[in-house]
Amino acid sequence: MASRARKKRPSGRPKERALTEERIVAAALQLIDSSELASFSLRDVARSLHVYPTAIYWYVKSRDELLGKVVAYATRDVIPPSSNTDWKVWLRDMCHRYRRAVQKHPNIAPLIGSQMRSNAGIRADFIDGVLTALAAAGFPDERIVDAYNVIIGALVGFICQELAALPAENQAKWAEAHRKRVSMLDVIQHQALARHLPRMANKAFIVRWSNGTEVPLDTSFDLFIDVIILGLEQSLKARR
């Protein structure tokens, strides 16, 4: 009896066990969490998943595309669960959710804050949520884009500055050197600085030697949201 001929494996998408886009993106995010963004590569992702690099390209076409998907994945839970609420409550909740998402993965902060490639992970639901909140606030169509840019620019700017990366090498040495620089600032000629520097040291932008992963700026972020919301309200009142 003739032996059965082996079936040829069909061409097309690779059959690696349970390989999906979500697994690839999650693995990429895990690698970015544990190393520097600059050294991240698709080969590293393939190695961590025990597949050939060519298998990755069935799901993402390039490193840039994958990085965009990583941002979308890391920020997937930033939209508040209910849209049927006051726009100020929604906006405040969204800002806190966005910050917590980036705090969990601080190595994506420079990707979000300074690289256009992060836009490849565009989330229509996130943009729609912000626009819906602004429309509920009363912003007319001709001003809603400016208000949207204020929110996104300010939010991303604060978070990425708060979580700014320390020097890649000799972090402890750099931190000690900057602490000394701060302590040696000329407070004699700058009275406001002399008064507030003890409170600001390592707790305020420019005069800190730890970033937000070690010394989070919680109360400053709360005030930041208050200012943004009040500013939006005042902007509406001024045009009426």
Model-derived segments and spans:
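N-terminal intrinsically disordered/low-complexity leader segments
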Residues: 1-18, 194-208, 240
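A hydrophobic membrane-anchoring alpha-helix module
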Residues: 213-240
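Helix-turn-helix
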Residues: 23, 27, 31-65, 69
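Hydrophobic alpha-helical connector segments
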Residues: 79-125, 141-144, 148-151
